[in-house]
A protein has these predicted regions:
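Non-transmembrane, aqueous-exposed alpha-helical and coiled segments at domain scale
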Residues: 1-137, 143-204, 209-290
Length: 290
């Protein structure tokens, strides 16, 4: 299989099949909800949808999202932006992606999902969190040193719910400390309600500037949900789920499937808390490329 074909296959699988850790979290959430409740029905429907999409190889959500590729820098000459764009255009032609890219000024549709700035491509070091996820069907240790490409698809509904706070925040009574960070995160969850297709996942960055904050927060969405959480992540997940917002905002025990937090250095004058929200359709996948 050549590189273009391998990337097309990556796009197809990412669009049609959830990672095992996300499926596991959804199934665990379904078991917690009261039988016959709105939350239980929503989660059952989500899981049925996932099974059908995986079996047919068709997109599991109509919004196939913004495509963001993280490419091991060792592959810079092999997996070029031109190669990636060719794969995206071919995947769109095959129906693995919908026509989902619009010129923000003219309103023109880029029917192959390819133009300047789309798809998004980042070349990163092999130790980047984006390349640390387990490759399907392989062990982490086996693939640790092999160059990889990771793809994440993020739909507009979840992207619209992402937000950034600047501390101190007088309206929240939030200062420049972890208590203030906690206030921002819980405020974001409360405001999101079910609009971002809950249950969701939060990627959080404490610090950084406005640009690196969003970048780091989004990268946290690539971390496995079954990875051992920090004490802060565990606490915030528990507190967010205690709000009772539930799947699709209809009430229930599971508002979030996970919280993943990173910290970045900041200048004295700024203290940002950035939250990248991902819906239940956390479509991410990694493939080795030799």
């Amino acid at each position: 299989m050549n590189v273009v074909d391998k990337l097309v296959d990556l796009i197809r699988k990412t669009s049609s099949s959830l990672p095992e850790d996300v499926l596991k979290a959804l199934k665990a959430a379904a078991r917690k909800e009261r039988k016959g409740s709105s939350a239980a029905v929503v989660l059952k429907t989500i899981l049925e949808n996932c099974a059908i999409a995986a079996k047919r190889g068709t997109p599991l959500c109509q919004d196939t999202g913004t495509l963001t590729f993280f490419v091991d820098e060792r592959l810079r000459r092999k997996v070029t932006p031109a190669v990636i764009k060719k794969a995206v255009a071919l995947a769109t032609e095959k129906g693995y992606l919908r026509k989902n890219t619009i010129d923000s000024v003219t309103g023109k549709s880029y029917d192959d999902n390819v133009c300047e700035g789309a798809p998004v491509v980042h070349y990163v070091g092999s130790d980047n969190v984006a390349l640390g996820s387990v490759v399907s069907g392989s062990s982490r240790s086996k693939d640790a040193l092999r160059p990889k490409v990771t793809l994440i698809l993020k739909g507009g509904g979840s992207e619209n719910m992402s937000r950034q706070y600047s501390l101190p925040d007088a309206a929240l009574g939030a200062g420049r400390d972890l208590a203030g960070v906690r206030a921002c995160i819980l405020d974001a969850v409360q405001k999101i309600q079910g609009y971002g297709c809950a249950p969701g996942i939060l990627g959080v960055c404490i610090g950084g500037d406005r640009a690196t904050g969003y970048e780091a927060a989004k990268e946290q969405l690539l971390r496995p949900l079954d990875e051992k959480p920090s004490a802060l992540e565990k606490r915030l997940l528990r507190e967010a789920n205690s709000l009772g917002i539930g799947p699709m905002g209809l009430g229930g025990k599971t508002t979030l499937l996970g919280v993943k937090i990173a910290a970045r250095p900041r200048v004295p004058a700024s203290f940002f808390v950035t939250i990248a929200y991902m819906c239940w359709a956390c479509r991410r996948r990694t493939v080795c490329v030799e």
